[in-house]
Amino acid sequence: MDVHDLSEEAKRGVIHTSEESLDDLCVDFRGRPCRPSKHGGTRAALFVLGFQAFEMMAIAAVGNNLITYVFNEMHFPLSKSANLVTNFIGTVFLLSLLGGFLSDSYLGSFRTMLVFGVIEISGFILLSVQAHLPELRPPECNMKSTTIHCVEANGYKAATLYTALCLVALGSGCLKPNIISHGANQFQRKDLRKLSSFFNAAYFAFSMGQLIALTLLVWVQTHSGMDVGFGVSAAVMAAGMISLVAGTSFYRNKPPSGSIFTPIAQVFVAAITKRKQICPSNPNMVHQPSTDLVRVKPLLHSNKFRFLDKACIKTQGKAMESPWRLCTIEQVHQVKILLSVIPIFACTIIFNTILAQLQTFSVQQGSSMNTHITKTFQIPPASLQAIPYIILIFFVPLYETFFVPLARKLTGNDSGISPLQRIGTGLFLATFSMVAAALVEKKRRESFLEQNVMLSIFWIAPQFLIFGLSEMFTAVGLVEFFYKQSSQSMQSFLTAMTYCSYSFGFYLSSVLVSTVNRVTSSNGSGTKEGWLGDNDLNKDRLDHFYWLLASLSFINFFNYLFWSRWYSCDPSATHHSAEVNSLEALENGEIKDSTTEKPRI
């Protein structure tokens, strides 16, 4: 009988694995079992949210104005400066996978944050020292001058810059997934409403950090110097560490569970080894670890990647088999979930490529516009990125207070709309951000070249505003989606995939810039300037590049619709809701004996 027969048999039984619930696993900072009256809850989460706001404030002040520093102070060409910034931010997000791995496997989220918080502070201090000491920078020079050749930073000067950025990237990257997972761990997984509210609150803290960074801290960098600005980032990060440590006695901590990659590898090896076997209809032939635990977690059968089901088939006549030849149902399900979310993850890469433009070319776009509000007051171009966060400071509470309860009544979903619907809404809106950017850049360029008039910097506000709204949907939806689909042993790692999407988006931006320059150069070899090949945006065709991104984003939205439907059609997509219902039934005494239940994979 084949795998389909096994799934049909499973449909007639209630299915459980032997994994403990997260509530049973959590301990305090001394390793003792948590007490609901003392540990976790909103009080503990507030300390984590404070750390989130301070850390975002520190890294955003550096990342969002970094292109100005490397262009004006390090004298890198504009395209190289843009690529350095996108590569830096991409590396920050890519290293989130390392942070998630170390947390889930060895350190736990709290210890991981303590270690890498110190590393990030050291990077900010090194940046401040370089910006302060003239001997660590090339001679001052006006990069916009057409008659002077500015000396680009090289040797030990460039090495100092790269070392500082690597420290910041390593620290911030390894922190990001753990902030979210550690904060979410302060609530019980069955409490979907509080979890959803936490994710919205985390984005609110993120927005507050961004807003202060893009206004106050960027103003400090502009008027007091980059050395003072980087020093302030170090001080702000230190304040965040104080907030994190202050909540130590209140935290629920999930202990590390050992290497998360070994069980995944075991599933593939076992499935390949037993590739010629046929799945039996008798569920007793499927391996489950023996356990005396009362709390169990349900798994729904997935018809996707059915070849992996063979990894948990018992071989007749063998009492004991190697874990590389026989895996548990939970292991197989965990691998299926990991493979199933990859297409959703991939569909958000273009979205983050658009974000990269708002932190690089759009800042330079603002530098080519009239930044004066009054005769004496100017807006730093990097502060333009604060516009969406000013709006979101008001939108996020309104979304949580009014939209979610209304949508909850209409849809029956505890989050108002499902995470997949929330992601799709954001992807749809992101296209219009690039449409607005292209239209404004075309008008800005024509006004300067034909009339010698500089448009007001407020003309580029719509592209930031629209993308800010789209990010409220996609970013929060993606974090909530990955966290809810993760197994208890992979919470930080799977949450890190959210940030890995940012990483790939920024790396793709660098590839697109280089490719577009080469393809659009007059002879195709890159020896003559392409759309983005000059240091002067009035000579470049940034508007064409924005139209290209708008087209890619529009196509990507329909690609996402296909994959989200593919994912939602599988019964295992309701895994988290089933888990919650089962745990509630256990607590109410509705399930008396889980040892007689049949497994489902």
From Swiss-Prot:
Tissue occurrence: Expressed in shoots, roots and stems.
Keyword Iron present in the record's keywords: the answer is: no
Listed Gene3D superfamilies: MFS general substrate transporter like domains (1.20.1250.20)
The protein's UniProt keywords, in alphabetical order, are: Membrane, Phosphoprotein, Transmembrane, Transmembrane helix, Transport
Q: Where are the transmembrane segments?
A: 44-64, 82-102, 113-133, 160-180, 198-218, 228-248, 337-357, 386-406, 420-440, 453-473, 493-513, 544-564
* Localization in the cell: Membrane
What the entry lists under SUPFAM superfamilies is as follows: MFS general substrate transporter
Q: Name one GO molecular function term.
A: transmembrane transporter activity
> Which InterPro entries does the UniProt record give?
MFS_trans_sf, POT_fam
GO terms for cellular component: membrane
By its UniProt entry, which CDD domains does this protein fall under? Answer: MFS_NPF4
Q: Does the keyword Cell wall biogenesis/degradation apply?
A: no
Q: How does it sit in the membrane?
A: Multi-pass membrane protein
Post-translational modification Phosphothreonine, affected residues: T112
The text of the family note is: Belongs to the major facilitator superfamily. Proton-dependent oligopeptide transporter (POT/PTR) (TC 2.A.17) family.
- Supply the name of the protein: Protein NRT1/ PTR FAMILY 4.4
Organism placement in taxonomy: Eukaryota, Viridiplantae, Streptophyta, Embryophyta, Tracheophyta
Name of the encoding gene: NPF4.4
